[in-house]
């Protein structure tokens, strides 16, 4: 048995300002820091064997807040996914074997919103109309100008999940993934076998842990959402 914990980052400054964020590397708001601290308290007793996060600061800061308060994790090492076969090549000492490894990958980044990035969502509705903005935000296959659709985001996020995260879960490890609303919705769609319509309507709150218990066949045995 293994545990998979998925958590969206705490509120960012641009979340607070109701702006499309995407790959813009904005920090957590004060409320977002408090949300991350609250999630950290909820997960303080949970043992994690390894963690995964995106290249974006808001996800990483949420992850570090969780690990800082975790009573089972005392030290960790970051490993960047550079695409090179050598990126993880190092000899671990006995002490380093106790370190929690954090894998950082662009494939877990938020959906890329293209020309909408930085634009206030209410302003976008004024410019393009409610229906068009709703389609860009909630349809599965339609991408905003020069951006990604949810389907495109799902392709990269699920591929990374299958190649990097599933093998760890099948070894019985407890995994923490701290990422973004759309990359995590894609993973949730995959593991819960949701339809495109179901995941398009699925709301994922900031800093609200989703904890799945699964077996080696990746069957979901239980799900718990902490709020």
Swiss-Prot record:
One GO molecular-function entry: phosphoglycerate mutase activity
InterPro entries reported in the protein's UniProt record: His_Pase_superF_clade-1, His_PPase_superfam, PG/BPGM_mutase_AS, Phosphogly_mut1
Keyword Isomerase (UniProt): yes
Signal sequence segment: none
CDD domains: HP_PGM_like
Record keywords: Gluconeogenesis, Glycolysis, Isomerase
Residues the record marks as site: Transition state stabilizer: 180
Example of a GO biological process term: gluconeogenesis
Pathway: Carbohydrate degradation; glycolysis; pyruvate from D-glyceraldehyde 3-phosphate: step 3/5
Keyword Isomerase part of the UniProt annotation: yes
Superkingdom of origin: Bacteria
SMART domains: PGAM
Residues the record marks as active site: 9 (tele-phosphohistidine intermediate), 110 (proton donor/acceptor)
Family: Belongs to the phosphoglycerate mutase family. BPG-dependent PGAM subfamily.
SUBUNIT field: Homodimer.
Biological role: Catalyzes the interconversion of 2-phosphoglycerate and 3-phosphoglycerate.
Protein name, per record: 2,3-bisphosphoglycerate-dependent phosphoglycerate mutase
UniProt lineage: Bacteria, Pseudomonadati, Pseudomonadota, Gammaproteobacteria, Alteromonadales
């Amino acid at each position: 048995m293994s545990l998979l914990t998925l958590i969206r980052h705490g509120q960012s400054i641009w979340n607070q300002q109701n702006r499309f964020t995407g790959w813009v590397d904005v920090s957590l708001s004060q409320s977002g820091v408090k949300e991350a601290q609250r999630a950290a308290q909820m997960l303080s007793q949970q043992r994690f064997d390894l963690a995964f996060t995106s290249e974006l600061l808001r996800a990483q800061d949420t992850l570090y807040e969780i690990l800082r308060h975790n009573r089972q994790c005392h030290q960790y090492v970051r490993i960047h996914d550079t695409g090179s076969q050598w990126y993880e090549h190092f000899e671990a000492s006995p002490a380093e074997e106790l370190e929690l490894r954090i894998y950082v990958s662009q494939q877990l980044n938020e959906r890329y919103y293209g020309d909408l990035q930085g634009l206030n969502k209410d302003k976008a509705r004024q410019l393009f109309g409610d229906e068009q903005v709703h389609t860009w935000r909630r349809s599965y296959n339609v991408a905003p100008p020069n951006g990604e659709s949810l389907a495109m985001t799902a392709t990269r996020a699920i591929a990374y999940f299958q190649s990097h995260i599933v093998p760890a879960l099948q070894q019985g490890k407890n995994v923490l993934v701290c990422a973004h609303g759309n990359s995590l919705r894609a993973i949730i769609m995959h593991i819960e076998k949701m339809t495109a319509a179901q995941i398009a309507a699925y709301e994922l709150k900031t800093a609200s842990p989703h904890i799945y218990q699964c077996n080696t066949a990746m069957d979901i045995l239980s799900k718990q959402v902490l709020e």
